Each structure stands twice: as structure tokens, then as C-alpha cells.
């Protein structure tokens, strides 16, 4: 992978954060900290894109009917009751 030297301007807050990460030994250089942050941003953007696609798919799937929780429970109870069982 080819590298490109890019210059960025950071505020005091982010510069101090980068410096502390390097000083603590978590990263070997400011570039490593920036790359780690960019990887997280890239992962987050991919997750957001997948979520947006799922939302659109759900919206386009159409509206079936309102969900009736009580009817759902009743149906599940009937389905799980032993066959031939009749309450008297």
C-alpha cells in the first residue's frame, strides 16, 4: 500500500489526546493514532450505511398489519397446547 504524506491541523484537545496515547505507549506515533481513528470512523460509516439500507428495505417492504401482542400470545398458547387436550 502506497503512503501519502498529508498535513492536518489539530486543535489543542486532539493534539493533547494524541500526545497522551503515544506517551502512554499505546501507539508508536501520531500517525498510528490517526490511522486507528480513521479505521474506527470507516467501520462506523459502514455500519451506518448497512443500517440505512436495512431501514429502507423495511420501509419498502410495505405495511402488513398492526401487531396485536395479546392475540400473538393467545395463538402461541394454542399452538403449544398438547393435541387432543380440552379443558372442561
Curated annotation (Swiss-Prot):
GO terms for biological process: protein heterotetramerization; regulation of DNA-templated transcription. Signal peptide: none annotated. Disruption phenotype: Cannot be disrupted, suggesting it is a functional antitoxin. No visible phenotype when the parDE1 operon is deleted. It comes from the Bacteria. Keywords: Toxin-antitoxin system. CDD domains: RHH_NikR_HicB-like. One of its GO terms (molecular function) is protein homodimerization activity. Belongs to the ParD antitoxin family. Homodimer in solution, forms a ParD1(2)-ParE1(2) heterotetramer. NCBIfam families: antidote_CC2985 (TIGR02606). Antitoxin component of a type II toxin-antitoxin (TA) system. Neutralizes the effect of cognate toxin ParE1, but no other RelE or ParE toxin. May act as a DNA gyrase inhibitor. This is Antitoxin ParD1. It comes from Caulobacter vibrioides (strain ATCC 19089 / CIP 103742 / CB 15) (Caulobacter crescentus).
